[in-house]
A protein has these predicted regions:
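Extracellular repeat-rich scaffold modules on cell surfaces
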Residues: 1-20, 24, 28-77, 81-88, ...
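N-terminal extracellular ligand-recognition/capping segment immediately after the signal peptide
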Residues: 20-21, 234, 241-250
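Parallel beta-helix/beta-solenoid repeats that form elongated, surface-exposed shafts/blades used
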Residues: 26, 243-254, 282
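Short, solvent-exposed aromatic-acidic interface loops
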Residues: 217-221
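Structured, non-catalytic alpha/beta "coupling" segments that mediate domain-domain communication
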Residues: 224-227, 231-240
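Catalytic-histidine neighborhood of serine endopeptidases
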Residues: 348-349
């Protein structure tokens, strides 16, 4: 076990740099910063509990794993350290048995950052800084690199702040399996009128993640912001919505799921009794299915994508041809443009 003394300040740094496949099994209590990286083809695995001011995964080509342990830090940064190099990345896997708690999670510091929340692990973001700044408690792409958060069977909780998809870089939240409880998501990037990032729920034929959204909702879905809803479930922790600043061009919500579709459950995910209202201000596109279940109401206030015929060398743009199905609760559609060329099913038919 390693325990930093009183002389250690939060500006001091302890570095682990693996060149083979080392396992760090002892517990670490350190008042300063811990930096870990793995060279190409190698892996550093931590199985002991860690308490520190920060844990930063440096941007090399190897991987850092946390397994059967607890990681408790004020700052968790992935893709950090060294000089600027757009070809490098840092990768952190939270594996089975890991419980991670961080006041701030920030990806893509000085290189690409990848954070995987795998089966049997949990990540909780406890910070409450929800400002539009680099100090935000949950930021997927700080500098001009990509930050990728993959939910792969684990659990993700951030109820005091929204997930900020981008700043100078472009963030991706890819929910394939597992459960996320989020206060919200925000696509506003660093510049005025700049919106970037991607939220991907499952795929066209696979995926079973459940992402529950709170009262902050999913905001600033405009410009280069991307939402693709495939196989999986969107749930409600409160009334929430998907929205954009009307001074800018809205992005569409693309429906991908063609097997069970995207399940939208408006029954409160906590008390399992309160019907919630979920409002989509953005229009729909794609050929997938959106299936409304549970007490509560889905409101479609957006305009579905209309088809655009080919002209000259410009390819045709298909309109929305998917399906919106109401199985339980209520559905409000502003007018026929909310469904466009798509299909509306009531009670399955």
């Amino acid at each position: 076990n390693l325990k930093g003394g009183e002389s250690v300040s939060n500006g001091d740094t302890l570095t682990f740099n693996g060149t083979s496949n080392p396992t760090v099994a002892g517990n670490i209590t350190y008042a300063g910063n811990i930096v870990s990286g793995a060279q190409t083809g190698s892996t550093v695995t931590f199985t002991g509990n860690i308490q520190a001011e920060s844990f930063k995964v440096a941007h090399y080509y190897g991987r850092v794993h946390m397994a059967d342990n607890e990681l408790e830090v004020n700052k968790l940064w992935v893709g950090a350290g060294g000089g600027y190099d757009n070809s490098l990345y840092g990768a952190l896997d939270l594996d089975s048995g890991n419980v991670t708690t961080a006041g701030q999670v920030r990806l893509a510091e000085l290189g690409h950052g990848v954070l995987n929340v795998n089966q049997g692990s949990s990540l909780t973001v406890t910070g409450s800084n929800d400002t539009h700044s680099t100090s935000a408690s949950f930021l997927l792409a700080h500098w001009a690199y990509s930050g990728e958060l993959n939910l792969r069977g684990g659990s993700l909780t951030a109820l005091q702040t929204s997930m900020h998809l981008s700043w100078d870089g472009t963030g991706i939240f890819n929910a394939a399996s597992g459960t996320a409880d989020l206060q919200g998501m925000d696509f506003w990037a660093s510049g005025s009128g700049s919106f970037r990032g991607s939220f991907l729920l499952g795929g066209a034929t696979s995926g079973d993640a459940r992402v529950n959204i709170g009262s902050s909702g999913v905001t600033n879905v405009a410009g280069a912001a991307v939402i693709k809803l495939g196989e999986g479930t969107l749930g409600a922790l409160s009334n929430w919505g998907i929205s954009y600043n009307p001074n800018f061009t809205a992005s569409y919500i693309e429906l991908l799921g063609t097997v069970n579709g995207t399940i939208l459950d408006t029954l409160d995910a906590n008390d399992h009794a309160t019907g919630r209202t979920v409002t989509f201000s953005n229009g729909l596109k794609g050929d997938g299915k959106l299936v409304k279940v549970g007490d509560g109401v889905l409101v479609l206030n957006g305009t579905a994508q209309a088809p655009v015929p080919a002209e000259g060398e410009t390819a045709a743009v298909p309109g929305f041809t998917g399906t919106v199905e109401l199985r339980e609760g209520g559905l409000t559609v502003k007018d026929s443009s909310g469904i466009g060329q798509g299909s509306l099913l009531i009670g399955g038919g």
